[in-house]
């Protein structure tokens, strides 16, 4: 049975993290299932190139390392393990400000995060296992086939596999709403996605707020 929403994430993207917390906030208020899927900023930007921006490339490499561990988590424990790992990754990277640890010492960082998620320690070693790249690349390509290639993360697909399946990039929000505000945004975004709107955008945004 298909989930009600597919959420495509790269763990190093702060905007995807905030959007994911909004999604989990609404999940507590509405009865729906989320399938946590992979999209790699490293793979997206490999085609575009980094033009000498080594900092971004290092961060995106770290994101791919995290996705490999998430793939190993899924292989062992399914979607629930991916959800637990992504929560632990986001809390460490974004809320805890530990992104540089992931970049500079990925194995030690991921061992710590896997432990926080309550998952088997051995999956942390998957960070350098490129055999996981096949599924990560496949899911990245699926996500981009639904939205077009000129986007990043997150990508959301409402009602996957259904006749009214609808995908979009975003929403990009600076702070995750809660309660009624979270539900209002959910209904608005789903309506826009299902209506066939291609783009609504402004480039001005506030800094991400993780509290």
Please state what every model-predicted region is.
Residues 6-8, 37, 157:
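Solvent-exposed beta-strand sheet faces enriched in polar/charged residues
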Residues 22-24, 99-211:
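C-terminal cap of thioredoxin/glutaredoxin-like
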């Amino acid at each position: 049975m298909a989930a009600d929403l597919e959420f495509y994430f790269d763990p190093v993207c702060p905007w995807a993290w905030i959007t994911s917390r909004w999604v989990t906030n609404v999940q507590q208020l509405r009865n729906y299932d989320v399938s946590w899927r992979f999209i790699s900023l490293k793979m997206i930007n490999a085609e575009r190139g980094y033009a000498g921006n080594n900092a971004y490339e290092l961060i995106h490499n770290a994101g791919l390392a995290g996705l490999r561990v998430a793939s190993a988590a899924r292989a062992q424990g399914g979607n629930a393990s991916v959800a637990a790992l992504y929560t632990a990754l986001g809390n460490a990277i974004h809320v805890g400000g530990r992104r540089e640890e992931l970049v500079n010492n990925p194995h030690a960082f991921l061992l710590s995060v896997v432990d926080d998620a309550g998952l088997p320690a051995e999956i942390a070693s998957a960070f350098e296992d490129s055999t996981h790249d096949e599924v990560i690349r496949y899911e990245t390509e699926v996500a981009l086939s639904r939205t077009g290639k000129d986007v990043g993360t997150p990508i959301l697909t409402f009602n996957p596999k259904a006749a009214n399946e609808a995908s979009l990039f975003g929403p990009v929000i600076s702070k995750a709403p809660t309660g009624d505000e979270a539900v209002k945004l959910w209904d608005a975004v789903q309506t826009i996605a299902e209506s066939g709107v291609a783009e609504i955008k402004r480039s001005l945004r506030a800094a991400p707020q993780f509290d």
